[in-house]
Amino acid sequence: MTPSALFHKRLIEQFTIFLSVDRGISPLSVQAYCQDVLLFLQRASIEATDRINQESVFLFVEKCHKAKESETTLARRLIALKVFFHFLKDAKMLDQQPFIEHPKIWKRLPSILSTEEVNSLLDQPLNIPNLDTHIASRDAAILYTFYATGIRVSELCDLCIGDISDDFIRVTGKGRKTRLVPISIKAKQAIDAYLSSFRDELQKKNPSEEHVFLSIRGKKLDRSCVWKRITFYAKLVTTKRISPHSLRHAFATHLLNNHADLRIIQEMLGHSRISSTEIYTHVASESLIEKFHTYHPRDI
């Protein structure tokens, strides 16, 4: 290993501890931050912390542009750098933090499933011939939980038996913050059906496992498996590109369309900033405009 590579490795190790312990950031977010920072150290040829300055940031941005990275990717990398520079200053490894100006990003509005598409999607697992009834029960519970609560895929995978009550689920979100999210009667029924059948059998393979959603080996279900199951069912009902996050978008937009308060939706989604939730008001507005052009007498 070269001296510069060794320097990068040690710096990233210290940064990892800062993110995990001091900031309480989830392992996946820590990994993403560290990948972006390591790329900065490599592209800007940083061999010592005193080489980190405004010029090195400009050089990094220039190389990102040459690599034809999107503005969204660049913005994410710069956010990671801002946190990294704060860490260095706190650790007295950097006298002055370089100024970072975030690029303006055009936010693409998410493609939203209609109520009819969601209902069709929710029905898929229990209506497919020859699909193992136990797997169908689990997948139905997953789909209902996503749409009923709007939680993230990582939050669903992390759900434990003790997190579920009759009316709420306790969700551990970004920054390990917990929140209580109401759950619908149908979603609770789907979860109970799964818990009383398939999960009880699976837990025999791994008695100490406390997570709700398990693989056929009795282990905690991972994000990639959930992603594959959702896309499998989605292809049966729509040509739209659907992911677990699509059900989160549908949850928020359908609540707004039915006049739910934006602040309540923000709380249920676990957004720290209202601006993250406001994107759904634009989606709801697009839906309103579409209905106007469909039903207004002068447009018929």
UniProtKB/Swiss-Prot annotation:
Protein name in UniProt: Tyrosine recombinase XerD
| Family statement drawn from the similarity comment of this UniProt entry | Belongs to the 'phage' integrase family. XerD subfamily.
GO MF annotations, alphabetized: DNA binding; tyrosine-based site-specific recombinase activity
Q: Which Pfam families match?
A: Phage_int_SAM_1, Phage_integrase
**Which residue ranges does the record assign to the Core-binding (CB) domain?**
6-89
Q: What is the gene name? A: xerD
Where does the Tyr recombinase domain lie? 108-293
Read off the InterPro entries from this record: CB (IPR044068), DNA_brk_join_enz (IPR011010), Integrase-like_cat_sf (IPR013762), Integrase_catalytic (IPR002104), Integrase_recombinase_N (IPR010998), Integrase_SAM-like_N (IPR004107), Recomb_XerD (IPR011932), Tyrosine_recombinase_XerC/XerD (IPR023009)
Which biological process annotations from GO are given for this protein?
cell division; chromosome segregation; DNA recombination; DNA transposition; resolution of DNA recombination intermediates
Q: What is the top-level taxon of the source organism?
A: Bacteria
CDD domains per record? INT_XerDC_C
Q: Which GO terms describe its cellular component?
A: cytoplasm; Holliday junction resolvase complex
Active site annotation, chain numbering: R152, K174, H245, R248, H271, Y280 (o-(3'-phospho-dna)-tyrosine intermediate)
Alphabetical keyword list: Cell cycle, Cell division, Chromosome partition, Cytoplasm, DNA integration, DNA recombination, DNA-binding
Organism for this UniProt entry: Chlamydia trachomatis serovar D (strain ATCC VR-885 / DSM 19411 / UW-3/Cx)
The entry's function note states: Site-specific tyrosine recombinase, which acts by catalyzing the cutting and rejoining of the recombining DNA molecules. The XerC-XerD complex is essential to convert dimers of the bacterial chromosome into monomers to permit their segregation at cell division. It also contributes to the segregational stability of plasmids.
Compartments where located: Cytoplasm
State how it assembles: Forms a cyclic heterotetrameric complex composed of two molecules of XerC and two molecules of XerD.
